[in-house]
Amino acid sequence: ATLRRQRQMCIRDRVMESEDGVLNGLSENKIWLEMSTTDEDEVKRLGNKVISKKAIPLDGPVSGGCHRAATGNIAIFVGGERKAFEKILPALTVMGRKVLHTGELGSASVLKVITNYLASVHLVALGEAWTVAKKSNLDLVKAFKGIAVSSGNSFVHETESQVILNGSYNINFTMDLVLKDTGLFDNLAKKLNAPLEISPKIVEIFKDGQKKYGSRAWSSMIVKRMEDLNKIDFRADGFPDELVDNEPEEKGYEI
């Protein structure tokens, strides 16, 4: 994981800060939008370099899942100067569906890390929920429908439970990426001197999942820890092996 992070930093440095990098191509009033999931400090560090070129920095991570990214049905969080946000809003409403201005530079990256952390918690909880459902001899198709219309529902259940029940686990997002995101959240909490209870355990669980199934295993395979521990599986008929976004296309808008 450390080596991978070092490689990512080298790529980022070359793209942004090399002689022929992005920074040297910026000039007055140009807008730089960082759309990856990264930490607030790094966004602000690069943002200061952008400002030194008299350009305007924004951070704009996206959320909604890979299947929605393929159709543009995603949320975009944007932090930074409001005027710059308004200038690029028409382009953002083509790229995504729901666009939110989150505040100052870096705020969008913080919010994205929070939402990814919540998704990871929901996924781990689903593994335990499906374990109890299976060992209670519930019909897993009916259990899926019941959870989906209940107070226990979540976006993660509506999407990832489908490929879990199918057995493909194919969510197009891998174990190492979840570890990166949960690590960003956990490190942010430490930087803020905010003691947490669940976050360190989530990091530990995904490290174990990476060790068992590999860095490039689908992140949904984290529930397989429960399947293996209990010597069961969560298979059910009628679920897809990969998610497809079937929502009707519509123009994006600010929320």
List the model feature ranges, each with a label.
Residues 1-7, 11:
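Single conserved hydrophobic/aromatic residue that forms the stacking wall/gate
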Residues 211-255:
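NAD(P)-dependent dehydrogenase/reductase Rossmann-like domain
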Residues 23-43:
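ADP-ribose/adenylate-binding Rossmann-like module
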Residues 12-18, 24, 38:
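Rossmann-like adenosine-cofactor binding region
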Residues 107-229:
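Helical "substrate-binding/catalytic lid" subdomain
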Residues 16-21, 158-162:
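Short, flexible, mixed-charge acidic loops at enzyme active sites
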Residues 37-120:
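Rossmann-fold dinucleotide-binding core
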